[in-house]
């Protein structure tokens, strides 16, 4: 599937321009007070960071195991034609890396 670059750039530029204009057309500025902020910062909000998903992505047996990492990416992106990437296929060894 080929995506024409110029129309995509024009559409993205229009979207950015539209959002920038919408931001400038907003109402009057609010005062910044402590009541405007949440009681806890987002840095400590575990659903916001999704730490459990990050931990599951870096299991001890698959971390820096390039074969397992490549297979994981292939499972996450099944819609790509992986035979079109012979260089990546050639870089993989026949056996998984010894950790």
Curated annotation (Swiss-Prot):
Asked whether the keyword Secreted is assigned, the reply is: yes
* Record carries keyword Magnesium: no
Q: Which Pfam families match?
A: KRTDAP
The primary site where this protein sits is: secreted
Q: Which positions carry the signal peptide feature in this UniProt record?
A: 1-22
Expression by tissue, per the entry, reads: Highly expressed in skin and detected at lower levels in thymus. In skin, found exclusively in lamellar granules of granular keratinocytes and in the intracellular space of the stratum corneum. Also highly expressed in oral mucosa, tongue, esophagus, and stomach, and at much lower levels in bladder and uterus. Not detected in gastrointestinal mucosa.
The record ties this protein, via InterPro entries, to: KRTDAP
- Outline the inducing conditions: Up-regulated in situ in psoriatic skin (at protein level).
The protein's superkingdom reads Eukaryota
Q: Name one GO biological process term.
A: cell differentiation
Supply one GO CC term from the record.
Answer: lamellar body
Compartments it resides in: Secreted
- Any stretches that span the bilayer, and where are they? none
Keywords on record:
Differentiation, Secreted, Signal
- Give a short account of what the protein does: May act as a soluble regulator of keratinocyte differentiation. May play an important role in embryonic skin morphogenesis.
Alphabetized PANTHER family for the sequence: KERATINOCYTE DIFFERENTIATION-ASSOCIATED PROTEIN
Query: What is this protein's name?
Result: Keratinocyte differentiation-associated protein
Q: Which organism is it from?
A: Homo sapiens (Human)
The gene that this protein is the product of is KRTDAP
């Amino acid at each position: 599937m080929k995506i024409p670059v110029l129309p995509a750039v024009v559409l993205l530029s229009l979207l950015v321009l539209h959002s920038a204009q919408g931001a400038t057309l907003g109402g009057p500025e609010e005062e910044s007070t402590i009541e405007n902020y949440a009681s806890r910062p987002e840095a400590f909000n575990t659903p916001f960071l999704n730490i459990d998903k990050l931990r599951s992505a870096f299991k001890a047996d698959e971390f820096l195991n390039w074969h397992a990492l490549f297979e994981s990416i292939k499972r996450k992106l099944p819609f790509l034609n992986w035979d079109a990437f012979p260089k990546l296929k050639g870089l993989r060894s026949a056996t998984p890396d010894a950790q």
